[in-house]
């Protein structure tokens, strides 16, 4: 019921939709092999490849001062990605909630109503995880809770707060608590 109240709250729903509509992005640079005619900028590394690359084409008929040039050169390619630590954290939170609800469903002493609520919550979380921005996101290698975007950016801040409440509630125990119920 606690996770259900978090997931079904308007604040959490709005936060996930804000993240989906405006996720944290970053540029990643990789090396790609391009045909020599498609290279836009020649850096120092590309110039070295022109002199060393063994896969060459004869251009002696073009009077360029060179007899051969390479067919391809490796050049840096920048790509915009949403696979950031902040988005990995949001995915981790959603999957943690989903895992918790799945565990609740498997408990033998869980009542029918509790199992039904867990199933509804799993459906909502599955819907969130199916958003296009989360399909590119990998599993987190570490949790960076001190990220400025996670603490300040709208949407991320609310998800962090919900996860902290959930995590603290999961760790909460006291002696004699069983006697109360």
Language model regions located:
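A short, highly charged nucleic-acid-interacting micro-segment common to nuclease
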Residues: 177-181
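Terminal, charged accessory segments of proteins
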Residues: 1-173
């Amino acid at each position: 019921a606690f996770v259900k109240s978090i997931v079904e709250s308007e604040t959490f729903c709005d936060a996930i939709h804000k993240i989906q509509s405006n996720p944290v992005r970053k540029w990643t640079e990789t090396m790609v092999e391009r045909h020599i005619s498609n290279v836009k900028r020649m850096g120092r590394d590309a110039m070295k490849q022109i002199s060393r690359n063994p896969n060459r084409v004869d251009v002696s008929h073009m009077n360029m001062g060179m007899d051969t040039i390479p067919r391809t050169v490796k050049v840096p390619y920048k790509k915009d990605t949403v696979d950031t630590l902040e988005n990995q954290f949001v995915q981790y939170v959603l999957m943690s909630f989903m895992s918790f609800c799945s565990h609740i469903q498997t408990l033998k002493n869980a009542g029918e109503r509790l199992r039904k609520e867990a199933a509804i919550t799993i459906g909502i979380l599955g819907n969130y995880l199916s958003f296009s921005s989360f399909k590119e996101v990998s599993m987190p290698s570490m949790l960076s809770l001190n990220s400025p975007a996670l603490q300040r950016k709208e949407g991320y801040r609310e998800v962090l707060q919900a996860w902290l409440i959930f995590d603290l509630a999961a760790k909460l125990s006291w002696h004699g608590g069983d006697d109360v119920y």
